[in-house]
C-alpha cells in the first residue's frame, strides 16, 4: 500500500509520476490530444448522475416548504456559535453573506455563465478558489438545515436564502427572495475561468499595459478571485488603479457604478476579513485536502486555527463599530478618517486611520474586552478617490435610506440575475415590481389561437411570398439567442423586431426587415378580424419557421407537422434594455455558418460552445447543422456547407456528400477557415468551413454523421431535425415546464 498523499501539496495518493492517469483520475485522450474537441460539454448533468431521478420536480417540492420555518431554522444557526468554528462577534451572518455573494458573484453577463443557479460552490474549482477560503465551513454550518428539509430545499437556494436571512437578522430589510434553483450534481466544466495555471495569476488575462484589458468573457482580474485583488492590482496598493479594475469586473457582472458602490459598501457594513497570520500556515484547499479532512480545506496551523487565529484572505480588516448590525458605519468611517498604508499581521497591504485615530471604536471579533480601530481595504478606498464612485458614496453617506434601498435592489439583482425571467421565481417573497434586467415579457391579454386559427395563419404565411430560407432563418435568429446559462434570450417576447436584435449583423437587417414587415402585416390583418382570438408577433415568428420546415420536408417527400404551442408575449422597447441585450449578439453562429472576427479559438470550438448554451446534445447539434445547411439558412446565403443540389429541401444530403469518398478537401488560404472539395477530375465540388468539416473530421461527430448519412436514415433525419428544431423554439417557454 502506498503512503498517504503529502498533506502540504494535496497530491494524488496513487504515485504515477509521468505515467498517463488511470481512467478514474481523468482521461488519457486529453493528454495525447490536448486540443481535442470536448463534446462532453453537450452532455451536462446526465440523468444517470442525478440521485433524485428523472421524475423529480424540484419546483413542486419547493412550493411545499414552510419558508418562515426554514428561515427560523437558519436564524438559529446564525446565532448559535460552534466550538469547531466559532462565530465572529457571536454571529455567523457576515460569513453567510460572503458565502451567498461568492456563490452568485461568479456570474458574468457576456455568456451568462457562473452564478448561484446550480449550487456550483460545492464543487471544484469554486470550492477551492483562494477567494472562497473557509466557505466550506459556512456550508457545513448549514448542513442541519439542508438535512432537515432534504429534497424540498436545494443547496443552490439555501445558500442564497441564508444570505438573505443573515441580512434580515442584522436589521436590514431585503428586497425579496425567489427560490427555484435546481442543484447540479457535477462541476460545470463548460465555464472558462481563465488560462492561468496558478492561483491568483493574472498574466494570461490582463494585457494592454496600463490600459489593463481584461480577456473576455472573464469577470475577475485574477485566477481564483470573484472580482479583484483587494490589495490592489497584482497586489499593488493603489486605490485609483483598483477602481478601474472594480468598474470593469462589476460591469461584467451587469452592475453599474451606483450598484457597485452599494454592493461593496453594503457588504462591508458587516463582519470582517481574516488575516491573523501569513497564509503560509494554511494547508491544501478543499478539493486537495486529505481523505480524513472530509472535504474541509485550508487546515490552519496558526494557533488554534480558528476564531481569533483565522486566516482567509490574509487581510485583517473590520470596517465598522457595529459589524453585526446594518448601519451607515462604512461610509462614516470611509469619509471620517484619513488613512495610511501598512502591512497587517497576515503580511497583506491594508489601511488604518492616521495618527492612531479611531482606536477603541471597533469591537474585537472574539474578545469582548478588546477594542480596535477600523481598517479599510485598498478597494474600499477606491470608493473615496475615484471621481465617479466618490460622489455616489458621498450621496449614500448623506442619504442612508437611499443607500439602503440601493443595496437591497443591488443585492437582489446580484443573487437572482442568473435565474432568468420572473416566471421562474418561486415562493411567497417574490417581489411584485417588474425590473428591466429580468427582461420582462407581458403575458398575452387575449384568447390564444386554436387549431383552426393556426391552420389559417399557416396558410397566410405560405401565401406571403416569403421563402423557406427567410422563414427558417428568422425563426432561428429569434430563438437561438437563448442561453441555458442564465435563461435569457429566445423567441418569446418577439424582440427580434426590436433594437438591438433587428440590427445585428448576423441577422442580415435588410432581409430581416422584409420578413418582419410581412409577418406584422399578417398579424395585424388576422387580429383585426379574428374576434377574441389573436396571435402575438413572437408566436407568429415561430409558427412561420415551422411552416418553412414543413414545406422543405414535404419537398423531400415527408409529410410532417412541426409542433406549435401558442402563448408567447410581445415585449416593448421600454421593456428592453438595449445595452443588456447587446451581450446576446452572436459573434459567431456555426448553425448559420457565420464567423465574426477576432476569435481566439477555431470555429468548431465556438460551435460546440453555442450548442452548449442552447442545451443541445451532440446528435441534436449535428442534425440541426445538417438541416439548416440544406434549408439555406446560411448567413448572406453563403454556399459554404450547402452540400446539396436541392437547397430548400429537407434531405440528409449534407451528411451524404460530406462523407462521400473520392473528394479531396484543401484549405483555400493560410487561415484554414474555408475549404474546397475537388473530385477525381479536379473540379471543385463543394466549399465548406470548419463548422462543416468538423462533422467528418472529429471521430465522435463523424460517428453521428454516419447515422444520418445512411440509406435508411432519410426519414429519421427529418424527424430528428423537427424534434431538435422544436426544442430550440421552446427553450424559453418556462410556462410549459
Swiss-Prot record:
A biological process term (GO) from this entry: cellular response to hydrogen peroxide
Cofactor(s), names only, from the UniProt record: heme b
Disordered: annotated segments: 1-29
Gene Ontology molecular function: catalase activity; heme binding; metal ion binding
Keywords: Heme, Hydrogen peroxide, Iron, Metal-binding, Oxidoreductase, Peroxidase
Cross-link (Tryptophyl-tyrosyl-methioninium (Trp-Tyr) (with M-253)): 101-227
Binding site for heme b: 268
Post-translational modification: Formation of the three residue Trp-Tyr-Met cross-link is important for the catalase, but not the peroxidase activity of the enzyme.
Location in chain, cross-link Tryptophyl-tyrosyl-methioninium (Tyr-Met) (with W-101): 227-253
Listed Pfam families: peroxidase
Catalytically driven reaction(s): H2O2 + AH2 = A + 2 H2O; 2 H2O2 = O2 + 2 H2O
Any one of the GO CC terms: cytosol
EC number(s) per entry: 1.11.1.21
Segments passing through the bilayer: none
UniProt xrefs under SUPFAM superfamilies: Heme-dependent peroxidases
Site (Transition state stabilizer): 98
Xref: NCBIfam families: cat_per_HPI, PRK15061.1
Subunit structure: Homodimer or homotetramer.
Family: Belongs to the peroxidase family. Peroxidase/catalase subfamily.
Protein's recorded name: Catalase-peroxidase
Species of provenance: Saccharopolyspora erythraea (strain ATCC 11635 / DSM 40517 / JCM 4748 / NBRC 13426 / NCIMB 8594 / NRRL 2338)
Amino acid at each position: 500500500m502506498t503512503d498517504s498523499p503529502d498533506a502540504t501539496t494535496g497530491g494524488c495518493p496513487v504515485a504515477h509520476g509521468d505515467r498517463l492517469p488511470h481512467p478514474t483520475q481523468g482521461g488519457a485522450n486529453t493528454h495525447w490530444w490536448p486540443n481535442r474537441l470536448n463534446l462532453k460539454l453537450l452532455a451536462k448533468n446526465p440523468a444517470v448522475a442525478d440521485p433524485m431521478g428523472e421524475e423529480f420536480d424540484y419546483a413542486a417540492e419547493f412550493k411545499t416548504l414552510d419558508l418562515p420555518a426554514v428561515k427560523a431554522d437558519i436564524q438559529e444557526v446564525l446565532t448559535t456559535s460552534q466550538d469547531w468554528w466559532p462565530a465572529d462577534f457571536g454571529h455567523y451572518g457576515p460569513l453567510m453573506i460572503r458565502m451567498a455573494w461568492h456563490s452568485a458573484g461568479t456570474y458574468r453577463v457576456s455568456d451568462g455563465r457562473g452564478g448561484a443557479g446550480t449550487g456550483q460552490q460545492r464543487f471544484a474549482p469554486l470550492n477551492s478558489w483562494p477567494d472562497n477560503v473557509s466557505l466550506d465551513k459556512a456550508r457545513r454550518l448549514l448542513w442541519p438545515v439542508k438535512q432537515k428539509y432534504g429534497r424540498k430545499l436545494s443547496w443552490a437556494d439555501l445558500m442564497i436564502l441564508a444570505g438573505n436571512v443573515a441580512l434580515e437578522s442584522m436589521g436590514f430589510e431585503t428586497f425579496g427572495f425567489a427560490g427555484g434553483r435546481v442543484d447540479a450534481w457535477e462541476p460545470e466544466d463548460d465555464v472558462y475561468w481563465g488560462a492561468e495555471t496558478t492561483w491568483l495569476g493574472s498574466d494570461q488575462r490582463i494585457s494592454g499595459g496600463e490600459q489593463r484589458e481584461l480577456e473576455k468573457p472573464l469577470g475577475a482580474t485574477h485566477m481564483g478571485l470573484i472580482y479583484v485583488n483587494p490589495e490592489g492590482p497584482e497586489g499593488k496598493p493603489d486605490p485609483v488603479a483598483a477602481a478601474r479594475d472594480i468598474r470593469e469586473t462589476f460591469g461584467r457582472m451587469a452592475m453599474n457604478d451606483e450598484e457597485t458602490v452599494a454592493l461593496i459598501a453594503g457588504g462591508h457594513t458587516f463582519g470582517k476579513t481574516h488575516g491573523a497570520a501569513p497564509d503560509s500556515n494554511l494547508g491544501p484547499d478543499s478539493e486537495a485536502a486529505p481523505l480524513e479532512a472530509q472535504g474541509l480545506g485550508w487546515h490552519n496551523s496558526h494557533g488554534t486555527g480558528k476564531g481569533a487565529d483565522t486566516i482567509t484572505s490574509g487581510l485583517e480588516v473590520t470596517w465598522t463599530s457595529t459589524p453585526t448590525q446594518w448601519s451607515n458605519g462604512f461610509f462614516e468611517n470611509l469619509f471620517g478618517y484619513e488613512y495610511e498604508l501598512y502591512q497587517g499581521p497576515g503580511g497583506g497591504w491594508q489601511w488604518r486611520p492616521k495618527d492612531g485615530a479611531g482606536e477603541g471604536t471597533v469591537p474585537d471579533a472574539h474578545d469582548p474586552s478588546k477594542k480596535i480601530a477600523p481598517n479599510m481595504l485598498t478597494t474600499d478606498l477606491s470608493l473615496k478617490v475615484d471621481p465617479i464612485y466618490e460622489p455616489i458614496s458621498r450621496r449614500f453617506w448623506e442619504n442612508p435610506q437611499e443607500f439602503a434601498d440601493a443595496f437591497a435592489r443591488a443585492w437582489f439583482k446580484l443573487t437572482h440575475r442568473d435565474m432568468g425571467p420572473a416566471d421562474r421565481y418561486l415562493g411567497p417573497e417574490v417581489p411584485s415590481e417588474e425590473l428591466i434586467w429580468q427582461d420582462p415579457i407581458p403575458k398575452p391579454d387575449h384568447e390564444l389561437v386554436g387549431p383552426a386559427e393556426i391552420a389559417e395563419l399557416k396558410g397566410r404565411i405560405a401565401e406571403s411570398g416569403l421563402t423557406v430560407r427567410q422563414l427558417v432563418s428568422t425563426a432561428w435568429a429569434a430563438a437561438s439567442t437563448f442561453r441555458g446559462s442564465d435563461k435569457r434570450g429566445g423567441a418569446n417576447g418577439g424582440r427580434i423586431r426590436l433594437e438591438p436584435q433587428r440590427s445585428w449583423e448576423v441577422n442580415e437587417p435588410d432581409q430581416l426587415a422584409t420578413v418582419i414587415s410581412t409577418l406584422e402585416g399578417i398579424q395585424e390583418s388576422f387580429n383585426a378580424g379574428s374576434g377574441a382570438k389573436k396571435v402575438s408577433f413572437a408566436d407568429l415568428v415561430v409558427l412561420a419557421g415551422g411552416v418553412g420546415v414543413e414545406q422543405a420536408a414535404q419537398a423531400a417527400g415527408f409529410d410532417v407537422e412541426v409542433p406549435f404551442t401558442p402563448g408567447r408575449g410581445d415585449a416593448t422597447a421600454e421593456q428592453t434594455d438595449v445595452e443588456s441585450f447587446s451581450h446576446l449578439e452572436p459573434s459567431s453562429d456555426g448553425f448559420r455558418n457565420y464567423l465574426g472576427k477576432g476569435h481566439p479559438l477555431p470555429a468548431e470550438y465556438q460551435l460546440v460552445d453555442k450548442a452548449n448554451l442552447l442545451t443541445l446534445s451532440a446528435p441534436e447539434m449535428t442534425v440541426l447543422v445538417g438541416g439548416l445547411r440544406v434549408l439555406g439558412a446560411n448567413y448572406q446565403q453563403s454556399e459554404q456547407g450547402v452540400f446539396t443540389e436541392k437547397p430548400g429541401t429537407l434531405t440528409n444530403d449534407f451528411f451524404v456528400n460530406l462523407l462521400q469518398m473520392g473528394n479531396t478537401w484543401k484549405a483555400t488560404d493560410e487561415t484554414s477557415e474555408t475549404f474546397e472539395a475537388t473530385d477525381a477530375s479536379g473540379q471543385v465540388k463543394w466549399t465548406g468551413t470548419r463548422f462543416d468539416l468538423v462533422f467528418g473530421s472529429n471521430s465522435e461527430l463523424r460517428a453521428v454523421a454516419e447515422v444520418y448519412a445512411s440509406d435508411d436514415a432519410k426519414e429519421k433525419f427529418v424527424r430528428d431535425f423537427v424534434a431538435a428544431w422544436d426544442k430550440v423554439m421552446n427553450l424559453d417557454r418556462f410556462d410549459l415546464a
